[in-house]
């Protein structure tokens, strides 16, 4: 039995989570799996109920589960709160308590959605499938920082710091992911300038020796940003640090044309993971039944693959999503086609899973 903590969260979170759970029920029945699913308050919902975004009840539930499935957090209702009391602070606390350090963000462009991409159609005939593996807990976002007054103003600094062990563990996750894909890794750094990047490159090369079947190449981050829009098909897995990954994963997401179909996973060394769509809580459309549930449904597929090792069930979900899109079914954010509500899109995916 697989234990799943579900955090519906705020805005459209509860709506898209319901469709994700509907898909879980379908694969549970089809593949004879068993899921122990428990919902917990989180984000703004938890603030309204408990006065904090990540209450002890939720924390204990997440820490005793095999995986966490999150909807979305935040909204203007809570914007006036202090930083550590806002819904988004709960997300940082959740990641820290779970000990996740690797963020995996697939950017998949289905041929049927190529008109939604800002790239030229002739670049997109083959579709697109990139996985960005970003280190989450080190680098310039977490290094020493400060601000001090000087004679004519201020001086501020942030420090990029990485240790061998931090680089090694994220590299292992990237190489393991590459084994399930096209067996190609592009490690992105700035080794021509930064000492931390030189350590990054050296460490990744050492890890690569354990994976002779995976092709490794290196690329400077500025060139990678250019190549993503010039020739995105050259990439399979992109491995990079915290700040570079923050930027490149958003760039890759925009190539796809809609964040409504993009899932993500945050992992640590074992099978425990946090799964969530990359879109926000979209309070402006909450309750209107037009939110796109596909990113959450595809996050469920990632959970089945990475936390539970249920590769066949995960692929079944992805194929059902692809079929729905190929047959012209859309939610409002995806443009022209047979426009479905949030619930109807979930039902369509379930229909194709059941066959």
UniProtKB/Swiss-Prot annotation:
SMART domains from the UniProt entry: Iso_dh
One Pfam family from the record: Iso_dh
Gene3D superfamilies: Isopropylmalate Dehydrogenase
Pathway it works in: Amino-acid biosynthesis; L-leucine biosynthesis; L-leucine from 3-methyl-2-oxobutanoate: step 3/4
Molecular function in Gene Ontology: 3-isopropylmalate dehydrogenase activity; magnesium ion binding; NAD binding
Binding site for Mg(2+): 222, 246, 250
Protein name: 3-isopropylmalate dehydrogenase
Taxonomic lineage of the native organism: Bacteria, Bacillati, Bacillota, Clostridia, Thermoanaerobacterales
